[in-house]
Amino acid sequence: MQLNPSEISELIKSKIEGLSVTSEFRTQGTIVSLTDGIVRVHGLSDVMQGEMLEFPGGTFGLALNLERDSVGAVILGAYEHLKEGDIVKCTSRILEVPVGEALLGRVVNALGQPIDGKGPIAAEGTEPIEKIAPGVVWRKSVDQPVQTGLKSIDSMVPVGRGQRELIIGDRQTGKTAVAIDAIINQKGEDVICIYVAIGQKASSIANVVRKLEEVGAMAYTIVVVASASESAAMQYIAPYSGCTMGEYFRDKGQDALIVYDDLTKQAWAYRQISLLLRRPPGREAYPGDVFYLHSRLLERAARVNADYVEKATGGKVKGKTGSLTALPIIETQAGDVTAFVPTNVISITDGQIFLESDLFNAGIRPAINAGISVSRVGGAAQTKVIKKLGGGIRLALAQYRELAAFAQFASDLDEATRKQLERGKMATELMKQSQYATLKVSEMALTLFALNKGYFDDVDIKRALAFESALKSHIRSHHGAILDKIEASKELDAETEKALEAAIQEFKQNGTY
């Protein structure tokens, strides 16, 4: 076969036209050392702090230490296949995780990858895990409640939408139980929940997920897991990943609730990473920026105004405010709240719920110490009926604790003091509540109203909870309209008060418990 010169030139021309040449300019370096999930990389001259690095085999890492002749990076995930001399590339990107409605009902790892065996997630997009918190001008004051369904919290330390309320206590005092009850109680409240499990046993996390599925709470919940078996790097980034997923809903004008369980283990993971990176240790061997570790995370929980939502959605959503409420959990050692991390988080948050081992072991559950638990902004968000009725409970408990200390030494007590002690004992008894047995506002109001009006005064303390349960059943069966009215209006007017009082008196005359 013979080709003439013109055909050859045409053939070459067409081949050149069909050839696509793209140049890719990326800084790359080589692995110098690799120990305990920490990599030293030489040659990454243009790398940025916090930048995502690409390793062979589809593995990624974060550049944390920028030194004169090398970069200290932490690997996200498995690193057994990596070796010295491997090529590392810069990506010029911050680590991003998937966000969107598709994540609801799913269990994901700290990178947003599904680990529940239910197939891939068709996410609406990805967002960086590190974001700057909304500024003061974009915020709105907290004035809507997050009902936890727990009498002791909603009446004494109320939580508002956009608030950061710390749950603090020793191990095995019911911290997770309080947070899970709060998530379960959001059913039908149009609040999206994110549960971030950090450094926990996989079996404990599986139990939580199973319970949320049982009660139908997974439909509006995302579970982010960095279990105890995962690397310190994954435990360190998990809260930021969960926060980004929650911010997606906040910025759309919706309400979200995020639980960090717990931030003590995140601080431990960060301390481990920092020490391996040879950063200078400070108090309790934590690095100097451990306060910033938690403050930059918790400041992202906020109530944002309509202008912010409109700006974030590009004008698609107008006239709606959004919120992200945070319930961080901190574990103390032997009740020491003056340790480094607990004091840091107490100073960052808008209040704290103290859970005590002594109360828990005495059968008072949730084991909330009403004296030192406080909500700094939640009072403005409390429902009117609970605010009206709950004030007396806190006072009764405060007076009871004060008098109980003196009563131990006094042989004879006057009638008024004895009554106050009895009222305090009864209030303590009625604040008890079983796990997963959350209450509606109207049911809570009924108990508080009956206690304030003295209807429990002649009830044997051992029968108090049985009396309360029977009273609720009676009112629900025979006077359901009263409860419905309180539930709808969240208020207690004079007419409803009279009707409720008459209904309770009727039960006291005829009811059995």
UniProtKB/Swiss-Prot annotation:
ATP binds at residues 169-176. CDD domains: ATP-synt_F1_alpha_C, ATP-synt_F1_alpha_N, F1-ATPase_alpha_CD. The record marks 373 as: Required for activity. It is found in: Cell inner membrane. Produces ATP from ADP in the presence of a proton gradient across the membrane. The alpha chain is a regulatory subunit. F-type ATPases have 2 components, CF(1) - the catalytic core - and CF(0) - the membrane proton channel. CF(1) has five subunits: alpha(3), beta(3), gamma(1), delta(1), epsilon(1). CF(0) has three main subunits: a(1), b(2) and c(9-12). The alpha and beta chains form an alternating ring which encloses part of the gamma chain. CF(1) is attached to CF(0) by a central stalk formed by the gamma and epsilon chains, while a peripheral stalk is formed by the delta and b chains. This is ATP synthase subunit alpha. It comes from Nitrosomonas europaea (strain ATCC 19718 / CIP 103999 / KCTC 2705 / NBRC 14298). The lineage of its organism: Bacteria, Pseudomonadati, Pseudomonadota, Betaproteobacteria, Nitrosomonadales. The gene is atpA.
